Amino acid sequence: MNAIFRWPFARSLSRVRGIGMTASVIAFSNVNAQPATVPSSTEKAAVDALIPWLLQEDAQLRGIPFSEVIFDSTGKHVLACNPKDETNARVLKQMSSVLDEVMARLNAPESPIQGIPRINEVSSHFEDLIRELLNKTPGLACDFPKTATGGKQRSGYPDLELVDQLSHRVYYLDPKLYAVGSRDSSFRTFYFEPKIATNKVREDAVHFIVGFEHEKPAADRQWKFTRWDLVDLSHFQVKLKAEFQGSNRDMYRPEAIVATSGKGPE
């Protein structure tokens, strides 16, 4: 079924950038791999308007305040972290002790991450240990955020939700691992995909990236992490990359195959 979704950041961009039109993103899904249907006149008009707009407004899709992306897609505010605030100062001190211990434990020769070949496979160990140690810290509670439907989900932003039980203040944490020398890289390392049912940002909160820097692994695959940083995302700016996607199911449709060496459908 074809569906038209209003672009959640159109209002924000119109206000901030002065864009004089409302954009709509067209999502075509062929979940049941049924024969393609002819788009309605409304859908075609939306596509015809969207493509030229994307081509002309590329520069306008950069430097978008992440706080506005979150508010427009979830209705929740990204709060700035003032380190001089009494509650923030206390929580930051507790978090700093935890992150020091996380790095020390995972750098140890007997750490479960030692010998893991790919850094992507290491990330979950950081999430689990951060969660474990924060939960052992008096006055703090940390867990995987619940989605709008009430379930817990590890994938997607943010990874962890920390609650200060005295003030009931919420902090969202998203651990990131990066190699020494790559702090200034322009390669994409962060993404946020607005969702409804699986939205995990359900509170006004401080949003933190928890960055861990690591040396390039030696031949013996020993990981060594050298520093951590807590990054406040209240002034973070993002850009939108518009792309049209399709799956193998969408491509390899029987009616679209005009020649093959195969003997028949799999």
Residue ranges and their predicted role:
Residues P35-L129:
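Interdomain/boundary linker segments immediately adjacent to catalytic/signaling cores
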Residues N120, E127, R131-V163, S167:
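A short acidic/basic microdomain associated with nuclease active sites
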Residues Y157-D159, V170, D204-V206:
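Extracellular structured ligand-interaction cores
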Residues Y178, R183-H214:
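Short, charged, amphipathic alpha-helix that recurs within catalytic cores of restriction-modification
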Residues V25-N32:
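C-terminal segment of classical bacterial N-terminal signal peptides
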Residues N2-G20:
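Bacterial N-terminal signal peptides that target proteins for export
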Residues V201-G264:
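Domain-level recognition of nuclease-like catalytic cores that cleave nucleotide substrates
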Residues L160-L162, Y171-A179:
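Conserved catalytic cores of phosphodiester-cleaving nucleases, focusing on short active-site segments
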